[in-house]
Design a protein with these regions (language model features):
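A short beta-alpha structural unit
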Residues: 26-28, 255-264, 276-282, 308-327, ...
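Flexible, glycine/charged-enriched surface loops at secondary-structure junctions
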Residues: 52-54, 111, 166-170, 220, ...
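Acidic/His- and Gly-rich active-site-bordering loop/insert found
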Residues: 3-84, 103
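Alpha-helical metal-binding/catalytic segments enriched in His/Glu/Asp
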Residues: 74, 83-122, 205-211, 217, ...
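Zn-dependent metallopeptidase/amidohydrolase metal-coordination segment
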Residues: 6-19, 72-76, 340-391, 396
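His/Asp/Glu-rich mid-to-C-terminal helical/loop segments that flank catalytic regions of hydrolases
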Residues: 201, 217, 221-246, 286, ...
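Midchain, well-structured core segments that form catalytic/ion-binding scaffolds
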Residues: 119-120, 126-285
Length: 403
């Protein structure tokens, strides 16, 4: 695989959404995400490939004349979190292009294409894997209208504003699907292994918890007469952490990543608060227990603090087990390439989890420096991306031989 070509691509993409304080911001359906798609389309054109958009704005990269043929498909996403890293998602799309470039250069008789998905991150609209979810039918129009940015724009509106018509197409023509991704954890980095063959993907359950107390003067209101919404929320934040810790044996985690306080003034007792809580794991029952513990904590806070509380599940999906034939082929490919590897589960969600219920799917993880991701400090080596691409291509060859 041509790591030098990969480096040129990353260099050209680097200015898009570059944040002066570090990292890149390429949120879904913004000009920055558009810029990523346009630039990657130009890479494909230079190699002689053709591109097409679907009803959600996902980009399909094919060999000329092979647009409608069943293909071994590689893909990931091009959007980012605010001040995120260069490699999250992007490495997987460019690895797909790298595989296609080698197939073309060596004139291999393999039908392969690459898909770049829109809106994998939930940062702007609170709904993850939207591009892949729309074209697989797991995310509907109602879901898109419920998902809104802080400005009040729905995800459906954002899609339509770009000229897309979600709900009018379905993903097809896929023999199997493979996604390369940085691990976003420290396992491979600390073990020194080059490849993680993913067996299952954890699924997130997202909760919105609301707390309505009484807004009062912070100096004139005695401590025993307060109905502090933020204090009630704080109890739930710690309860969520305890819930995650109690399920560590099942690899379940719980995170409070969003806190909104009203009015948010130093001399005012908070009258209202809202939390965004993320619970995820590969064991459905374990996730359910953690969510139940958080619900119980909310009821307890409501009773003890005289604050009205509510909880809403904003999104939920089941953990996904990946295809054993694809897993075995990627394991065999790693051995064939002489690489140290391991089987592992993914704690983060990925587009592959939307594809897996419909088509045989697998994932390849590569290390990222110190396990850091969703951060300006995110880093992976070009050589590791190229090695991962080589494993995907060898996996395709193995599956073709054993089909």
């Amino acid at each position: 695989m041509d790591a030098g070509l990969l480096g040129e691509w990353f260099d050209e993409l680097a200015p898009i959404g570059a944040d002066p304080s570090g990292g890149v911001t390429r949120l879904a359906y913004t000009p920055e995400e558009d810029g990523m798609f346009e630039k990657v389309a130009s890479f494909a054109a230079r190699l002689g490939f053709v591109t097409a958009e679907d009803c959600a704005g996902n980009m399909h990269i094919s060999f000329p004349g092979g647009e409608d043929a069943p293909c071994h498909t590689i893909g990931s996403h091009l959007d980012s979190v605010p001040r995120g890293g260069m490699y999250d998602g992007v490495a997987g799309v460019l690895a797909g292009l790298l595989v296609m470039e080698k197939v073309r250069r060596l004139r291999l008789s393999i039908s392969v294409k690459t898909v770049a998905f829109r809106c994998e991150e939930s940062s702007l609209f609170g709904l993850a894997t939207a591009g892949s979810g729309v074209v697989t039918g797991s995310i509907g129009i109602h879901d898109l209208e419920r998902a809104k940015s802080a400005s009040g724009q729905s995800l459906g509106e954002a899609m339509k504003k770009k000229g897309y018509n979600p709900g009018t197409c379905r993903l097809g023509g896929i023999i199997d699907f493979t996604e390369l991704h940085i691990e976003q954890g420290r396992v491979l980095w600390e073990s020194g292994e080059k490849i993680g063959v993913v067996t299952a993907i954890a699924a997130p359950t997202r909760l919105k918890a609301t707390f309505l107390g009484r807004q009062d003067h912070s100096g004139a209101t005695p401590m025993d007469l307060r109905k502090d919404a933020l204090c009630a929320a704080a109890e739930v934040i710690l309860a969520a952490e305890r819930a995650g810790r109690s399920e560590m044996g099942f690899a379940t985690v719980a995170t409070t990543g969003v806190i909104r306080v009203t009015p948010g003034a130093l001399n005012v007792i908070p009258g209202a608060a809202e939390l965004g809580i993320d619970v995820r794991g590969i064991d459905k029952e374990s996730v359910a227990r953690a969510v139940a513990a958080i619900r119980e904590a909310i009821l307890t806070a409501e009773g003890s603090r005289g604050v009205r509380c509510g909880i809403e599940v904003t999104s939920a999906s089941d953990p996904v087990t990946l295809n054993e034939d694809v897993i075995e082929s990627l394991a065999a490919a790693s051995e064939k390439c002489g690489l140290a590897w391991r089987r592992m589960a993914s704690g983060a969600g990925h587009d592959a989890m939307k594809i897996a219920p419909l088509f045989p799917s697998g994932m390849v993880f590569i290390p990222c420096r110190e396990g850091i991701s969703h951060s300006p400090a995110e880093e992976a080596s070009l050589e590791d991306v190229a090695l991962g691409a080589e494993v995907m291509l060898e996996g395709i060859k193995i599956r073709r031989e054993t089909a």
